Amino acid sequence: PASEKVVKHVDRCLSCLSCMTTCPSGVNYMHLVDHARTHIENTYTRPFFDRKVRDLLAAVMPYPRRFRALMWLAAIGKLFAPVLPQRLRAMLALAPSTPMSRPLDAGRIVWPAAGTRKKRVLLMPGCVQQVLAARINDATVRLLTRLGHEVVVADGSGCCGALTHHLGKEDLAHQAVRNNVRAWTGEIDGADGIDAIVVNASGCGTTVKDYGFMLRGDADLADAAAKI
């Protein structure tokens, strides 16, 4: 089982991956930390409050509508912050006080290119990002369509899986990955094909690039994940 000392150090890792860019031996610390997080989740018993917070994050943050609702509740909760425990006050302080953006509608979305279509790209709208910073996706769509790119959000795509992956909840993360691989493969193999996948959140991009490794043992989707 993981010790408290190990858990403390792994929990403090931000997965910035600076260690990988500076390591002269090329050690893949990303996969080592990912393995450690899963091992901790499966073998270490966290305090009750910590377990419930992590379960709440896994159940809410990957789903934009749930996350938006939680942010509204947090904004209301700030009114009662003075009488709440310190840890809850600290968490509420992180929540935005301004109105949150409404997530994109579910299902397939297509923004046609302005003029002659030159390229066709998939857009990963993200989960947390499209609630807290939807203008980034809006600007991306405007720019790409103006440059002659058709932009598509695939039906069935969603969270990249990074949130649950970093919580050590491997099964939930891999399910999110499978959902995206299936959704994107349908567009990639379609009549019009796909020229690129556009990801605005760097953490999501890092995870998507690792889909081949994450699903390396999946008999049905390993090849499709590696292609992505």
Where are these regions (language model features)?
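N-terminal cofactor/phosphate-binding cores enriched in small/glycine residues
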Residues: 1
